[in-house]
Amino acid sequence: MTRQRTVPPEAVGVAVLAVHNLAVHRALPAPADAALNLVTAAGLTGFARHAGFSPADLGIDVRHASRGLRAGLGAAAVAAGAVALGAALPATRPYFRDRRVADVGRGEAAYHLAVRIPVATALAEELLFRGVLLALFRRRRSPAVAVLWTSLLFGAWHVLPTIDHYQGNPARDLVADPSRGRRLAVLATSASTAGAGAMFAWLRLRSRSVVAPALAHAAINMSAYLAGRRLVRVGGRRPPRRRSGPRRSPRGGGPRPRPGRPGPAGPARSRGAGPGCGATGGGPGPR
């Protein structure tokens, strides 16, 4: 009698996330990805429960929610402070300036800050990676190995959005060769998000709840979004004019521009204030 081989549950989880990632970034229109994030998170959570994982295994046990809330609020404060410091330092400020948020209206920005970032991105991704995927890997592996694998997969999760949104971040101007700059951006983003994934996993295991990493994740993305929006808007402001009065041309033909100042067409548009396209991804933003 032959032994029937079963597919490891973690392989199912990885396959579902890979298909989801390709569908979001290569097939579906942009507004659909937020809803699909939540659907996939709910679906994989249901799959894990059906496979025998308890709410505590998945970090969704309500008995640990208050502990996760306390740990998450502390981590969120530290994370937001780190983002604010990075946006304030001249050496790292260009990485936060994203021209896609320049023309985003207040209504759309409010949607990103109230729904898209904290719920459809941070909460959904924490349920997927630090909830379901971490539990699936921990069934047959040590916690350290499970954290390593899920963190690397979290870094890979951000490869496609980094490629798609590379043109939106002025940091690309720091590298002359566009293809080399894109590769460096992918490597840097994958490494940084993998590191963040390890930190989120530590919070999840320490607090026994996905609430803690979800709050820290949301704090990073929301503060980065706000910083990018502020930097782009400040960078795109028109410099103030002097109130000394216009200079007349010798023939009396009207005001003449001052030397060194723009002519009637007005000042050139700032490099950091290009057209925005909604949610951010490769730089500071909800992806």
Regions found by a protein language model. Give the residues of each.
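Terminal accessory regions that mediate trafficking to/through membranes and regulate activation
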Residues: 1-3, 287
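Structural signal for membrane-spanning alpha-helices in multi-pass inner-membrane proteins
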Residues: 17-24, 44-51, 83-87, 158, ...
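Short helix-capping/hinge motifs at transmembrane helix termini and TM-loop junctions
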Residues: 28, 51-52, 90-91, 158, ...
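Juxtamembrane helix-loop-helix connectors linking adjacent transmembrane helices
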Residues: 55-122, 138-139, 172-180, 234
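Transmembrane helix-loop-helix hairpins at the membrane interface
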Residues: 110-237
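Compositionally biased, low-complexity flexible segments
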Residues: 237-287
